[in-house]
């Protein structure tokens, strides 16, 4: 497994993997698509043509690593790269009357070495023209780029694209596709956070992880006044090709993406990840090990939320473990899942650089039957916030063999809150700390005599108020150890209930402890299910060290 080290930020997700052989696969046509910056020959294009291209490409050998960049681009620093600006006067839809959306392209350079081809499509005639790279599309400012090295490099291509929405045209983008098959979007805060990918391959296997590339995009010319646009993408890698259609709705408070893909396997694939997403979790209310900074919490997402095919809602708080962890949650035709950032309180982060309280959640809603499979969650140890250490995706149960073809349809919601909510009580927060004493009576003279770990899980909403007089019962299941000192506490400031228990080990094992809990009233579940993974310390660390100096 290749533990990717992508640098966080819109300019810092380096692309890896193969080039595309699409040049020989285009059909010929005689008419032009309408775009002032498109300068290539006309060719007919629609989604069925793209599917045929991806299918035919899968029958050919993958072309391997990208070709070298001109020296002036290959040696760029991140600061120099970020100073390059696309000329807004030459944006893709600059001349569309009453345009509400516009698109610009990212320059090649630094870690972005894979050429991405761009095409403008007239949706009325289905005719496309390529947009070739030329230096006059960009403003180089203080980047120190030797533009003479770029003259005549019309096949250099671009690194990706981003889309702007009125009234912030050319100022604040709302959608970005940059690096391999990574893409992101924002909600009404305009703050980027976690990323999605076109596909994940061998994320957690004994093989090196493979990162497919989007190697070409086709943009339907946006309609006047429209806030929805359609872009098509060709995906290519050593093991698979794919045709993608993104219908992207840039709404006032969220971005919604309707995604349809058709995939064609070149090789057998051990682990195929559908609708993958990548996030960061360094520390939070439940995981304090790496919180030795001025910030109480540091994370893009605080939980994995799952709405299972059987209707069960699950909340799985994220971790920053000391050792890489991968968990797979079995399901059949899942209703939805996502990495959520539900804590939106600035005081819980105190971060005026990262603005983690403004980062969007990402929810996946399958639009066709996905069948049996698992939702995979990988958590990688990190010492800070510059590593995306959380990966989540859907893995079909059926093994992928060379020559297989399959299609998935799903909707992505980039928003502060997911589009659907558990009607039962929901987990608001998870906290852990020292146990072994009555709540409110942490001894000041000495530590508790017996070591234990306390867990406090806050539930809000649902029918908790109605259930309280009848009796609320926490149902706790542990893979090892035992739960004691179980308490149910009403928390007035949140108008919810805290379930608190102490975990005591029953062996010397340091294997992760899988915890499961939900609330029940008169035999009926009244909350979503809380899942947690705790990593007990070694036996010789299960003691409290009194380091006070009393004299």
From Swiss-Prot:
Domain of life from the UniProt record: Bacteria
Sorted UniProt keywords: Periplasm, Signal
UniProt pathway: Glycan metabolism; osmoregulated periplasmic glucan (OPG) biosynthesis
GO molecular function, one term: carbohydrate binding
Pfam families associated with the record: MdoG
Location(s) in or outside the cell: Periplasm
GO CC annotation: outer membrane-bounded periplasmic space
PROSITE patterns, per database record: TAT (PS51318)
Biological process, per Gene Ontology: beta-glucan biosynthetic process
Principal subcellular localisation of the protein: periplasm
Signal peptide range in chain numbering: 1-32
Post-translational modification: Predicted to be exported by the Tat system. The position of the signal peptide cleavage has not been experimentally proven.
Keyword Membrane attached: no
PANTHER family hit by this protein: GLUCANS BIOSYNTHESIS PROTEIN (PTHR30504), GLUCANS BIOSYNTHESIS PROTEIN D (PTHR30504:SF3)
HAMAP family noted in UniProt: MdoD_OpgD
Family of this protein: Belongs to the OpgD/OpgG family.
Function: Probably involved in the control of the structural glucose backbone of osmoregulated periplasmic glucans (OPGs).
UniProt-recorded name of the protein: Glucans biosynthesis protein D
The species this protein was found in: Escherichia coli O9:H4 (strain HS)
Gene that produces this protein: mdoD
